[in-house]
Amino acid sequence: MAFTFAAFCYMLTLVLCASLIFFIIWHIIAFDDLRTDFKDPIEQGNPSRARERIKNVERVCCLLRKLVVPEYCIHGLFCLMFMCAAEWVTLGLNIPLLFYHLWRYFHRPADGSEVMFDPVSIMNVDILNYCQKEAWCKLAFYLLSFFYYLYRVGATVRYVSA
């Protein structure tokens, strides 16, 4: 059994894709937590709980921001590895999400070093819905990619007969 550089790339990508799936699942859980915190009518009228809700939103947004750049870098590494391994079909499948990540990164708010997920704007229902839909779409993409990479690991490993 001989491993090629492409097989190594697929194996590494398989492991990193699993970590991206966990990142995105955490995003979905965090957005759902923000949504339920936003919709709870009993807690909306409680002023003593308001400060705690604001701190919770700030904490969640801070944690979300810490996962954005690693996600973008890992996906950029995928594209770089597939380009070096001359896996053009796989690179072509990953390029649209890479361009979206670049667009999203370069169109972040200009008022600071924060990439996105501002505590004030995230509580806007439209922005929260957009972020949640984006997370579900990314989860679908990463899950499909995971199984594609799993298939390609087996397809790129060549068995050498004796």
From Swiss-Prot:
Pfam families: Cornichon. It comes from the Eukaryota. One of its GO terms (biological process) is vesicle-mediated transport. One of its GO terms (molecular function) is signaling receptor binding. Residues 1-10, 94-138 are cytoplasmic. It is a multi-pass membrane protein. Keywords: Membrane, Transmembrane, Transmembrane helix. SMART domains: Cornichon. InterPro entries: Cornichon. Residues 32-72, 162 are lumenal. Belongs to the cornichon family. Regulates the trafficking and gating properties of AMPA-selective glutamate receptors (AMPARs). This is Protein cornichon homolog 2. The gene is cnih2.
